[in-house]
């Protein structure tokens, strides 16, 4: 249901951080489970779409939580790109000048990386690190993501970064686009809905980053362009959304982020999905439908 309430501003979202995070707690210790009805509706949604659906969502003020397959492993896909940009901000941009560094790359590198809607147009000039962060989060540009991974020391730098923020599960092992193969038996390049949801919360609402870096990362997420048919489709139009999507083989289709209702506290939201067939298409209505259920339950 859409309302006519005033949409919260980006400035509001960028200043709510630490205060809102006081209710994040340590994962499950302070969580208040939501009603069984929403779990049943998520199960019905999963069956309707013949998929595996994983959900973690939490109202950071009340602690009320929805968890469905929240501790099962799912392919991470491009939701790692938020962690890559965050790691660059925290570990490489200490003097505030690293984001201005220009990185050069070849057309062959773009071709090898796969989907690259931004970097493909800047082969001749290269791009700054800041521009690469913007491209990989807002447009899910694979070349930009790989170049950031290269600066960080490779995919396993994301695993180390996740551990340093208190995430014991999330791991990255391969580069784009190989990391999206998403075989059901694979434990590499995976996360869980709870783990990645809480990591995003620590980055956007908590103190995992310095205030300047948190504001910059949040701004990129607020201006994401890839979730129009996923979270954005399922949430009321007047809710602010800072998120990152991802997708791969076996119908893997993810959306993770923070959303702000007009008159309420932030809600952490993580929806990860897979399907049984390798060539299954992404099921955006499944992700959007889950987001709608979570919004109705936790607002």
Where is each model-derived feature located?
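Structured C-terminal helix/loop/strand segments within mature extracytoplasmic catalytic/sensor domains
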Residues: 2-19, 34-42, 151, 199-228, ...
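Beta-lactamase-like hydrolase cores
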Residues: 29-75, 294-297
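Mid-domain, small-residue-enriched loop/turn segments at the edges of structured enzyme/sensor domains
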Residues: 49-52, 146-205
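Extracytoplasmic
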Residues: 50-52, 69-71, 79, 100, ...
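Active-site-proximal beta-strand/loop segments in catalytic clefts of secreted hydrolases
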Residues: 58-60, 107, 137-140, 175, ...
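Active-site SXXK
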Residues: 63, 75-105, 136, 269
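Flexible glycine/proline-enriched surface loops and loop-helix/loop-strand junctions
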Residues: 67-70, 128-132, 139-144, 176-184, ...
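Conserved catalytic neighborhood of penicillin-recognizing serine enzymes
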Residues: 109-147, 155
